[in-house]
Amino acid sequence: REPALAAHLRERQLGWDVTDFGLGDFARQGLTLFCVRNGKQGDPSSLPYAEKLLFVGEGQVTPFHAHKVKTEDIIVRGGGNLMVAFSRDGSFADGAVVVDGRAVADPYAQPIRLRPGQSVTIPRGVQHSFWGEEGQGDVFVAEVSQANDDLTDNYFRDGIGRFAQVDEDEPPHRLLWNDRA
């Protein structure tokens, strides 16, 4: 109904995003996101930052991936604990991983447990994966980063995709950001 608004939302990838990374098992490997703010990468007249809300199910994994452009902070806002693992395999940088202002000595040794209120800074180029810790419930997470482009700045270690194929078996109640014309 509002083409200019729809174009603004789509260009900035604002709104709902639900993915199973093309793997077909959302409960085990999936993520629900809502992009609240986002600029356009490379556009100096645009916001230089992005903010997303992430809803991570208990045991639900976001597979290993890295970003060439953005550095991001992952902040656990509530619910259970978030487990974050790092891998040198597929990484194209080796920056310092920082939890609440303290550098992690060897982030690749074992997953980091983030409790509500804690955060981790993930440098660009570092492969990372996260999931809700088993037995602790679903996790409400915020991501604050440089302007984000999910179409071009996600590099999955295992060659999977970022977006799901949606089976449109009924009319949508809420549009995903990439459903807007």
What does each model-identified segment do?
Residues 81-121, 131-181:
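Double-stranded beta-helix
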Residues 52, 72-73, 110, 118:
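Short, conserved secondary-structure segments in the cores of folded domains
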Residues 57, 111-146:
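Conserved metal-binding segment of the jelly-roll/cupin
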Residues 1-49, 170-181:
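A short, N-terminal "cap"/entry segment at the start of jelly-roll beta-barrel domains
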Residues 41-50, 61-73, 77-78:
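A short beta-loop-beta micro-motif enriched in histidine and acidic residues
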Residues 57-58, 69-72, 76-91:
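Glycine- and acidic-residue-biased ligand/ion/polar-headgroup-sensing regions
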